[in-house]
Amino acid sequence: YGEDPKVETNKFAAICTHLEVCFMYSDFHFIDERNESIIVESGDPNALLKHRFEIIEGRDRTMAWTVVNSICNTTGVEKPKFLPDLYDYKENRFIEIGVTRREVHIYYLEKANKIKSEKTHIHIFSFTGEEMATKADYILDEESRARIKTRLFTIRQEMASRGLWDSFRQSERGEETIEERFEINGTMRRLADQSLPPNFSSLENFRAYVDGFEPNGCIEGKLSQMSKEVNARIEPFLKTTPRPLRLPDGPPCSQRSKFLLMDALKLSIEDPSHEGEGIPLYDAIKCMKTFFGWKEPNIVKPHEKGINPNYLLAWKQVLAEIQDIENEEKIPKTKNMKKTGQLKWALGENMAPEKVDFEDCKDVSDLRQYNSDEPESRSLASWIQSEFNKACELTDSSWIELDEIGEDVAPIEHIASMRRNYFTAEVSHCRATEYIMKGVYINTALLNASCAAMDDFQLIPMISKCRTKEGRRKTNLYGFIIKGRSHLRNDTDVVNFVSMEFSLTDPRLEPHKWEKYCVLEIGDMLLRTAIGQVSRPMFLYVRTNGTSKIKMKWGMEMRRCLLQSLQQIESMIEAESSVKEKDMTKEFFESKSETWPIGESPKGVEEGSIGKVCRTLLAKSVFNSLYASPQLEGFSAESRRLLLIVQALGDNLEPGTFDLGGLYEAIEECLINDPWVLLNASWFNSFLTHALR
């Protein structure tokens, strides 16, 4: 199927081994003139002898099916759904040969399940000398089978002595069902014949043509095979060919994450041991009580489009209702806010048009979708690079325990757990890890409340937990969320929420970043600095936002980012190890001198320690989750194609392209207004500059 043997080495080895077993199965077996099976091992066999087995495996598919068809036509044997490996002229049946690195009976069942045919005989060999065959009929004599088993054992030892066996053994997948021949009849058959490309008379013709398509031939040849209409001139791709991506103009882009990142401020309690510890509302009230600088709130940066007094009233309402809770005998576990005018407005209550069943309105003559405006273009702003840099930094707390990146299911090999521990040590204090835990907490709490209290405006504290340098537990409060009505039937149905988050960042410094927020000043905080205590205004960033079941589900699984970046690091270690022919995990993490490429900036290729690489990869993965969007999906997929072409140029592979303009268009239509996509595009331009030097 056009796999590259240099890349898919295990698959290549499996294909070769299987082919060799098929050949050995057939070797020396003949049928004499009395139609008896005989074994002839010496030189030139008698001309009257006929080979007992027809070898089907190893031919190209068109030829193989031709052989199968002709056997079926001459013998009347039922035509198999999948290409078998051999045909036995003595027993008049097809044979499926299996060679497995797993248990023979498991593999046998998979094979039997796949081919679902009583007629085809199955014979499985393993590398450990076990075998299994249909109805325990092993067809061949002991000696022939022993030859095959010995050969397999030799291959295994040869592989093991070169350190290749473990990888080969583990790489075996279950049966793949590529070969199935669906018999298409009736209407479907007529439709299939009608929908063929021009110049094909029947489905069979077309299939034979597709099967004969050489996957690795030259592109021009392929194109000329396709159609007279395609005239793609292959243009050589040279250092001077590519141009930088065009980033959009317009006002600077604004913050669109579901919660504040570098600008967040926490109210914290250490060693929490209060009554009801671990109940979010109790924890939140305890955190609020640690701060004494509250003052009469006022608006310092209004939201352009919103009714700003409502945001102010919403915050005052939160303070008042928290006060009410404290006056009660017993603090409740959850708090539902009164449905005031300001909250109804902020949560879009009764704003959504009523949903009507399509049946009831399909006769409306001018039925149409809402007119929606094109998104407004935005330019790249410097704040998003600062956000990314911050996410790569170390904090003074640890946000995950050692076992946060799940245990392995299999008995864990020493190397894997060693890598995981090294990696965890590098990222446990990283700010991106704080964002993961914050995201998991918020999404879990919001999804929970959305299901448990559908009609209520529930108050949800934004909380995280960590450990200080001294190992003391700490509970942090970032602010609050108030959830709107949440009758979420479909994955994409939206629940609105208002977020209110503490911060020390003055919004007037980068007003464009805070376009979607109304910012209040709500207190003064005393901070210890080198010059003693200073008082700083404390701000509250308020905005309405929304999310859906599917987004919350992904948000709850943000820990996967740890796994993704760990796997990227592992592949770097694997590359090093295969060059040095020994496991390089320890050296990789403990070498203090070596620097690694981290990314591109206008200054050139940035380098850093291995820890910095881990944290940068993690931050990228986390930002892909925090700033997930269709623009990012499109940009990642399309820009990757340009990246591969540029890399091919760097590897002196003389790449050629057609319709490069179309590729640029596909990439640039994703560059609209998303801060993370714009930043990635500007990084991509830096990469282009340096790669084409």
From Swiss-Prot:
Any one GO MF annotation of this record:
endonuclease activity
- InterPro entries annotated for this entry? INFV_PA (IPR037534), PA/PA-X (IPR001009), PA/PA-X_sf (IPR038372)
Q: Where does Mn(2+) 1 bind?
A: H18, D85, E96, I97
Name of this chain's protein: Polymerase acidic protein
What does the subunit section of this Swiss-Prot or TrEMBL entry state? Answer: Influenza RNA polymerase is composed of three subunits: PB1, PB2 and PA. Interacts (via C-terminus) with PB1 (via N-terminus).
Which GO cellular component terms, listed alphabetically, does the Swiss-Prot or TrEMBL entry include?
host cell cytoplasm; host cell nucleus
Q: Per its UniProt record, what HAMAP family does this chain match?
A: INFV_PA
Q: Where, by residue number, does Mn(2+) 2 bind?
A: E57, D85
Q: Which family does it belong to?
A: Belongs to the influenza viruses PA family.
Residue span of motif Nuclear localization signal 2 (NLS2): 161-224
At which positions is motif Nuclear localization signal 1 (NLS1)?
101-116
Q: What does this protein's UniProt record list under function?
A: Plays an essential role in viral RNA transcription and replication by forming the heterotrimeric polymerase complex together with PB1 and PB2 subunits. The complex transcribes viral mRNAs by using a unique mechanism called cap-snatching. It consists in the hijacking and cleavage of host capped pre-mRNAs. These short capped RNAs are then used as primers for viral mRNAs. The PB2 subunit is responsible for the binding of the 5' cap of cellular pre-mRNAs which are subsequently cleaved after 10-13 nucleotides by the PA subunit that carries the endonuclease activity.
UniProt-annotated location(s)? Host cytoplasm; Host nucleus
Gene symbol here is PA
Listed transmembrane segments: none
